[in-house]
A protein has these predicted regions:
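Accessory RNA-recognition modules of RNA-modification enzymes
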Residues: 1-232
Length: 233
């Protein structure tokens, strides 16, 4: 609404109430974590006076500080499997001495970790490395596969570019399929590593129900989906 009225200068006579989500915890089907050798030091850390020996982090970027990452111990945005996977990968990489990425110096091995968990129960994990160190890659991917047999799509990427996007990168399947299945109202969708899908699956269904009701569709209507939000890639 703000973008339409303030930026586009579009007059909106009436704004309907926000359609709230019933689920406010563990509702996301996709999360992406970033590895960094420069963790964000919290106020609690500063007040404690403790020396922080481990500056590595696997978590979320800090707004306004692109090179700093807040290390996440427990995330409430996704199923707890996501927490277990993240903590396992973090601990394993540190134990093996795999360097967390330094985005300023463009150095290190471990870049990002993406977890997708579909409403069908299928799980996709994408590990992004900064260098083609195949022995280390195989070692970590093998450990993940052994620890988490529930992962149905285990993939990895070697991204040697400056930015983190993998849209133009080759995605390599280590185990399982190169997609997971998602379902909405009896319809099946194949979600690939580069696909876009509404991150709140349950709320997406509610959104589409509203759109369908407002469109007043009839059984013989021909409907075009021009947003192209879903596509296997």
């Amino acid at each position: 609404v703000d973008a339409l009225t303030r930026i586009a200068k579009v007059e909106i006579p009436e704004v309907n109430p926000t359609l709230g989500s019933k689920e406010t915890f563990c509702y996301r089907n996709k999360l992406e974590y970033t590895f960094s050798c420069k963790c964000w030091i919290t106020f609690e850390d500063l007040r404690s006076g403790r020396e922080i020996a481990d500056r590595n982090a696997l978590g979320f970027h800090i707004p306004g500080a692109f090179d700093k990452v807040l290390d996440i111990k427990k995330c409430w945005l996704q199923d707890d499997l996501s927490n277990r996977i993240r903590l396992f990968v973090r601990q394993y990489a540190l134990a093996k001495g795999y360097e967390f990425y330094d985005i300023k110096a463009q150095q290190g091995l471990m870049r990002t970790l993406m977890v997708r968990i579909a409403s069908t129960g299928e799980v996709m994990l994408i590990v992004v490395f900064a260098r083609p160190e195949q022995e280390k890659i195989n070692d970590l991917m093998g450990a993940i596969a052994a620890e988490f047999p529930e992962i149905t799509s285990l993939l990895y990427v070697v991204n040697q570019k400056v930015n983190d996007t993998i849209a133009d990168q080759e995605v390599i399947t280590y185990r399982g399929r190169d997609y997971i299945n998602e379902e909405m109202e009896g319809l099946q969708f194949r979600i690939g590593p580069k696909s876009f899908y509404q991150t709140n699956s349950l709320q997406a269904y509610e959104l589409y129900k509203v759109a369908r009701r407002m469109a007043c569709l009839k059984p013989d209507d021909l409907v075009y989906d021009l947003t192209l939000e879903i596509g296997r890639a």
